[in-house]
Every structure is written in structure tokens, then in C-alpha cells.
Amino acid sequence: MIGVERVQTGIRIEKRLLKVLKGLAELKDLSVGDLLEGVVLHAFEGKTAFSKETLAQIAELKKIYRLTLRAGDSHQLRERP
């Protein structure tokens, strides 16, 4: 184990995306924070964070929560008034 110092943060995130993240975290027995740390650390190194099996689980969660957003949509999202 590597010792780290974590801080509490408040972020705003798209509602359906959060539902998918929470569902995946539960499937993997992780906190959402641990899941996000892993995804970001993999992305920083240009690596995929997920196996084919996990990607299939994500696809199912996206269907369940009607998440249609894709990578190309990032940085273009605007909150509804």
C-alpha cells in the first residue's frame, strides 16, 4: 500500500454519469473516489482503466441509466437553466 493524503472535494457532475460511476463502484466494491482516482491515474499514462469485462458492465449500466454522452461530448456540456 502507498500512503496518501486525501482531501474532501465537492464537484458537480452530470447526473446519469454519476449513477453509472456509483453502480460500477458498487460492482467493484470500491468507493466512487477510489474508482475516479484509478481512472484518472490510468488516463494520465494513456492507459485504459477497464478490462473488456468491465467495459461490458459499463455498457449495461449506461443502458440502465440512459447515459448517451460520449467522450466527444466532454468539455461541451452546459447545465440547463
Residue locations for each model-derived region?
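Short interaction-prone segments
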Residues: 49-68
